[in-house]
Amino acid sequence: MGSTSSLYAAIDLGSNSFHMLVVREVAGSIQTLTRIKRKVRLAAGLNSENALSNEAMERGWQCLRLFAERLQDIPPSQIRVVATATLRLAVNAGDFIAKAQEILGCPVQVISGEEEARLIYQGVAHTTGGADQRLVVDIGGASTELVTGTGAQTTSLFSLSMGCVTWLERYFADRNLGQENFDAAEKAAREVLRPVADELRYHGWKVCVGASGTVQALQEIMMAQGMDERITLEKLQQLKQRAIHCGRLEELEIDGLTLERALVFPSGLAILIAIFTELNIQCMTLAGGALREGLVYGMLHLTVEQDIRSRTLRNIQRRFMIDIDQAQRVAKVAANFFDQVENEWHLEAISRDLLISACQLHEIGLSVDFKQAPQHAAYLVRNLDLPGFTPAQKKLLATLLLNQTNPVDLSSLHQQNAVPPRVAEQLCRLLRLAIIFASRRRDDLVPEMTLQANHELLTLTLPQGWLTQHPLGKEIIDQESQWQSYVHWPLEVH
């Protein structure tokens, strides 16, 4: 057995897709080894009597035969298979499940909507950064889960019987993307939401997180179109107009929307617009994980950390043998600089967090080689799994690390969309200066400094005589002033 005993698998038999996640436990965190997803569209096989067609069941079994091959290497006690909305509804679910268990060689559990909502919330709590008090929205194929909670604790759980497959069959059956079909789909979704809206609003939230294919598709569209990753009602309405303009489902073309997501995109979009409107949501971001992650973390009995980003940074520092003392030293200098200029530059708290995160990882490129360390660092951060950081935040971190020294590549700072371009430039300047002044790798050799910002001009004041006593330091700072001046960042050092 050996190396397979640390493997865990979670399978989710959803109404639209079947998913399998295989992970390995590594030092209290999970490393993803396999993700397999197949569009089975089980919900589309339900007739008016809620009986599943033989074709739909066969599609499901065929998919499970693929999964079964991968499961043979994993201890049965470390596998969880759950079925959701369609198999809760189907009158002949028993037939499907009996054969599914035979194929997989392990039990299949049909979970209630509330249990599904709880697991989704756990998956989000383990993998998503940001404020503690959250609303989680997951639009599935045949049900939509809405959960409020604080930290690891849920405060209200709802599973509503509407989903992107059932709404597709009901309101877009003619494949027409006209305003009237969207209106009908949204109106119906709002009616389903209305009875639970008050309780959700009563519990309240500081952040709203989406955890489903629809939200993933929106994120992909927004990244492809160079928008920032925050989903707002205004952006949803713009995408709806674009869909209406396309006219028919088979002609739906939106930059960044993949073919496999296109079929259920309009119905998912209508449900999401209804949720935004009914609950008065200002903005939503994509979750780092959901149902499958909830199942895996549940099997591992890992506690939810208050600060997921910190856990992620710690794990990566250990894995790449980063000098943690030096990372902290640079972070301390950068935080000091940030605090001195934040009012003048109107910087937000999240920008400070991201700057400190960049400091914690700035030497990761050395684990590959000293030559081109910034490029190695950017590559690693762009491609590592970083729970707690959104895709846009990862891109910003990679861009900051790419520009931590040497001439500045301004276009890369403008291509990220986690923060406005000007803020990315400002964070980059602070990171570069912090790295320079902590470079002797000793706390007692970091000088006392004041940094003042006046619009784009930075004035750095060093102790009397410091520049004369540190000729190499002076040379490095002169070079830095020159590099910053090339991109019109005025820097004066006294």
UniProtKB/Swiss-Prot annotation:
CDD domains linked to this entry: ASKHA_NBD_EcGppA-like
Gene3D superfamilies for this protein: 3.30.420.40, Exopolyphosphatase. Domain 2, Hypothetical protein af1432
Top-rank taxon, per record: Bacteria
Signal sequence interval, chain numbering: none
InterPro entries for the chain: ATPase_NBD, GppA/Ppx_hydrolase, Guo-5TP_3DP_PyrP, Ppx_GppA_C, Ppx_GppA_N, PyroPPase_GppA_Ppx
Gene Ontology biological process terms from the UniProt entry: guanosine pentaphosphate catabolic process; guanosine tetraphosphate biosynthetic process; nucleobase-containing small molecule interconversion
Pfam families: Ppx-GppA, Ppx-GppA_III
Enzyme Commission number, as recorded: 3.6.1.40
PANTHER family to which the protein is assigned, alphabetical: EXOPOLYPHOSPHATASE, RETROGRADE REGULATION PROTEIN 2
Name assigned to this protein: Guanosine-5'-triphosphate,3'-diphosphate pyrophosphatase
Annotated source species: Escherichia coli O1:K1 / APEC
